[in-house]
């Protein structure tokens, strides 16, 4: 019986996309909430968000099977389906992240970093809500289950993204301190 149509690859893809949304927390704190302490950490946050998003989308593309199915998926839209909306949400998030990274790293357009950050923050909330809604509509037969999964995905995004970012920064610091210790001795 095919009550749940997604398998383990889809779960990993959605997890990576949720982490991509959440790992942007540090950049959001620096630009949206104007916390100067987080400014040096923000570009890494946005780059990691892009990397996790591309990883999750690569898993979804591999699940399509033949390469010609990707062309069909990109050119044929059913706008009544939330899956079609997610194509725009995912590609839009990638584009917004590229612009956001550009505004953070280029001094000539640095003044646009805050508006780009606010737009990226809003877009990622919509993206995570859409992803949570898909799961809600697929697995919930009762109305209360559908409504609670979108906020749950936002919470998971905030938690998983922050933890993954912390672990990556911690690993980088451990690696660089080991390299610095090796050079000193």
Regions found by a protein language model. Give the residues of each.
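Membrane-interface helix-loop-helix modules in multi-pass inner-membrane proteins
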Residues: 51-108, 135
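Membrane-entry segments of alpha-helical transmembrane domains in multi-pass membrane proteins
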Residues: 2-19, 37-45, 76-92, 115-118, ...
